[in-house]
């Protein structure tokens, strides 16, 4: 967290060690109804080629981030890529799948996650120590979605009320593409707010997560997709919608970008284990290798907020980590200089620290700092 903008930068500069470019404050109209896929607010980057990566058994990995997996696509920094995703367990969950079958699929990949991740994508120029800026340009879901909880009698720790919900429950929902909504049941409509539950780069060799097969002495052994970490992975942060940018530290050559665990809507907490789970015809991303930035943990920018992240098996520690990141960020920004005590107070007054999820073993908190508090400074 040691990047700063030049002292001569305008008062409207995106004030961060994380983000390097001039960004105007979002208008009231933008804050209320951001256009789908519109990045007019973002730094301008010349687009390169556009690529497509379809989902297949070759391009989609089930439950593990394997740094030795051969890249399925190589692109240049600034290129755009349209990625297709699968439903969990290599698309084996489909309308009509029973809870008994879901349980069998969960047991079929011991230690691994249920997630189907498309990738990896090798980004030329992305090197360890860089930051990969990932712009989420467009998300187009497929035709249906699902939500389920596993039976608490068999999985007593998976879900906030697992011990109170002994039976499993699964429900499927056709998606109304015109309304961008599903009907939960007559009288309840859920508008879609699609976002990738998992956006990841290649693993951090120092990730303390268990490795595939119980390997303990190989830092390049595959890591389960269950837990979020410094490389992103299963963050389940519902702010990662169209028009949002994610910044992730790079650990391996080429970045190695993956996405999956596609969601069509999720409440903060993801309390019963799953969101409105779906798959995407397309999630269009623009990865940009940033050599002018340094990060320890994922960082997010939306039209209206800067967002820090914190993860830990203990929810209190996850909160502490997210708050610390927010305080350090504010204390190092150059738009309105402040010390750590002032930053700490500011986060307490205006920071919105939310529980991302409590079901991924390593729990998540994200702290949202509103851009609007700096609007008077930008007008002066």
Task: State each model region's role.
Residues 194-198, 203-205, 209, 214-315, ...:
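Conserved mixed alpha/beta catalytic, RNA-binding, or beta-rich assembly cores of soluble enzyme
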Residues 10-24:
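Bacterial N-terminal signal peptides
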Residues 88-100, 139-150, 254-264, 356-358:
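Short, Lys/Arg- and Gly-enriched loop/turn segments at beta-strand edges
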Residues 56-66, 110-118, 223-231:
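Short, structured beta-strand/loop micro-motifs enriched in basic residues and often containing a Trp
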Residues 138-240:
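Intrinsically disordered, low-complexity linker/loop segments enriched in Gly/Pro
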Residues 1-13:
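Bacterial N-terminal signal peptides that target proteins for export
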Residues 36-109:
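N-terminal, Lys/Arg-enriched amphipathic/low-complexity engagement segments
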